[in-house]
Amino acid sequence: RPGDVHTHVFAQQFPLMDENGRMQPYMLAERERGVHFDVGHGSGSFWFRQAVGCFNQGFWPDTISTDLHHQNVTGPAIDLLYVASKFLAMGMPLQDVLYRVTRAPALSIHRPELGTLDVGACADIAVLRNREGKFGYMDCGGARLTGEGKLECVATLREGEVVFDPEARSMPDWQNAPAPYWTAPGTTRSWTLWK
């Protein structure tokens, strides 16, 4: 039905290609009918031989997600940004990757207030860096694809408040820290920094 979601779309058990490497007509027909295709990358549900073949024929997933659990956080899924980075490596433009991990999932579950930076929306924000270099990405079959970018989270805000800041971007330099920094309970600062 329109609006249904087919997840694990690039799993090995789905016959996405015919014997000549062309996309199966049923995939295109289902998309035309309004079925959404989701990645749902877990331990066995993402194979480059499926995904790249579809990409080369213009068939991209509607949403990029994980099926993350304790058995795949060390590979092959690892985390959502690792999965998103695989799509960069396969040639999906950054803007399309970001849309498919933010806005598209929100719309598919009928939550238009999520996945947006509109004025008045909840300020849930991930600040990302696209690090350049050579990076290897694994699929569920133990094969590798090399890419030239890797998405990394440098800060996260939840409802406008910083909740993750591994590079201390929201903190003052220690020399300029406010008064409570400089005292242990029951003491006062008795020295000055010389520059």
Residue ranges and their predicted role:
Residues R1-T74:
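Active-site core of metal-dependent hydrolases
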Residues Q12, S43, R103, R131, ...:
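Short, solvent-exposed coil/turn elements at secondary-structure transition points
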Residues N20-G44, V83, M90, C140-V162:
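P-loop/Walker A phosphate-binding loop and immediately adjacent motor/lid segment at beta-alpha junctions
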Residues S43-G44, A104-L107, G133-Y137, G142-A143, ...:
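A short linear-motif detector with a strong N-terminal bias
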Residues R49-E132:
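His/Asp/Glu-enriched, well-ordered alpha-helical/loop segment
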Residues A123-P178:
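C-terminal cap of metal-dependent C-N hydrolases
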Residues D173-K195:
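Long, low-complexity intrinsically disordered regions
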